[in-house]
Amino acid sequence: MSFDLPGVKPGSDFETLFKAVGFVVVQWGFAEQSLDLTVASIFHFYHGQPLIKRRPSLLKSKLDFLSQCFAELPNLQQFQEEGVPLLSRFAVAGKKRNDLVHGAIATPSAQDGAHMFMKIDVIPKESHSIRSVFLDQTDWPAFRKELLSLGKDGQSLAQRVRDSLKVHP
């Protein structure tokens, strides 16, 4: 199977960039799915209770929902010590992921080992702001490792939350 990229030379900065951003997109999908599974398990188990009004769909609302559930629902408080730091890690990685995915490439090649993107932040009822975002080869190994860890740690937590809710009728 070949997924040739027209106009992109093998081994070029663009090929490296496309591979890195592609990895971020695919691995983030796997990692964030763990949040979706956790939210779905809780939502279906507790449906109808005051805390559970609407299933969250955006990352921030999922993180807020899960944090609140771990703090306020007795069956889930056992996950608070582990869950809250994990949710914080998701928030940090999610911002970087959003910057890369929703930013536009600003330079045709890496400069000083970094690809630069321009990101427009939309601020309702205010002026938009434009900022530079960098995908730096020195930061890449740690970010790649964090994305892999979020997938693993998130899936583990999702399974344990689901299993704990099966035990508590």
Task: Label the predicted regions.
Residues 1-26, 30-169:
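Acidic, Ser/Thr/Gly/Pro-rich intrinsically disordered interaction regions
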